[in-house]
Swiss-Prot record:
UniProt entry keywords in alphabetical sequence: Membrane, Transmembrane, Transmembrane helix
Subcellular location: Membrane
Bridged cysteine pairs (disulfide): none
Transmembrane region(s): 124-144, 145-165
Protein name as annotated: UPF0496 protein At3g48650
Topology in the lipid bilayer: Multi-pass membrane protein
Domain of life, per lineage: Eukaryota
InterPro entries membership: DUF677 (IPR007749)
Length: 277
């Protein structure tokens, strides 16, 4: 049974990767997020530290590289404007609708087949596929938050309903017992809980991005003055504040992703260990 658990987990992750390529909305959203955060990271790649140690330049030329970087970031304007917000909302609404619709279909199916245990199980199968789809999406969005900021994880995306439905069906084909049915019911309930938990994590990260923009706005407003005056103390102030804010962003992003990945590991692998008990 452990081998079966490993096999199913590998199949889920494989499907997640391919689904990301096939889903234009998700692919567009991920590309937009990566592009915007990469541009924002120009501040962190500022040559400020190197220029601070450089004694060959003096006067107005010492922080030329840092000033150029800061000016480019300011020229980018609103990286997370209406277009990005629309993409985020489209992905969220699409999967929330899938979750709600599949739940409704499950309930309707059970009403029509109250005495048919096998049909009832198929209803749970469909609902579980939708739940796992939503769950994997928010795990992936959490992972992406770290990818674009620290370039780490890019392994999980949204799986399609059909393959998951087929896999769960295959699991049930060899088991008609009440014990198996109860285990599956408990499994789906826990998946439902984790799906909602991951949605809340996604909202938290969105809030984190908004906080970053609020904090960085007054810093970018001082760039014009720094470029114009080219004063050493002004450049130092702008650069140090920018780097400090980005450090906070990276730290909080890592903590969020660790929570997401913890849920992912439990949901995609350890939940299936129900079959070993």
């Amino acid at each position: 049974m452990a081998a079966l658990v490993e096999f199913i987990s590998d199949r889920v992750l494989s499907s997640c990767k391919s689904a990301c390529k096939e889903d234009p909305k998700l692919r567009s959203y991920i590309s937009a997020l990566r592009e915007r955060m990469d541009k924002l990271m120009e501040i962190k790649r500022s040559p400020f530290e190197r220029e601070s140690r450089d004694t060959d330049f003096g006067g107005n030329n010492k922080y030329a590289g840092t000033l150029e970087k800061l000016n480019k970031v300011k020229a980018l304007g609103d990286l997370f404007g209406d277009e990005f917000t629309t993409q985020y909302k489209a992905i969220y609404d699409e999967h929330q609708m899938l979750l709600n619709k599949s739940h409704h279909m499950q309930l309707e199916h059970e009403k029509k087949h109250k005495n048919d245990k096998k049909s009832k199980r198929l209803g749970y199968i469909f609902f579980a596929a939708a739940l796992l789809s939503v769950l994997a999406l928010w795990i992936y969005l959490g992972a992406v938050s770290l990818v674009v900021a620290a370039k780490v994880v890019i392994e999980v995306a949204t799986p399609s309903i059909a393959p998951l439905w087929k896999w769960v069906t295959e699991i049930l084909e060899d088991s008609e017992s009440e014990i198996a049915y109860k285990k599956l019911t408990d499994l789906f309930r826990s998946m439902d809980k984790n799906a909602n938990l991951n949605i809340e994590f996604a909202k938290t990260f969105k809030s984190l991005v908004e906080t970053l923009l609020t904090r960085i706005k007054p810093i970018l407003e001082t760039v014009d003055y720094a470029v114009e005056q080219r004063e050493e103390e002004t450049v130092k102030l702008v650069s140090k504040k920018s780097l400090r804010i980005l450090k906070v962003l990276l730290t909080k992003s890592r903590k969020l992703v660790q929570m997401w990945l913890g849920v992912a590991k439990w949901s995609l692998r350890e939940e299936l260990m129900f079959w070993n008990t």
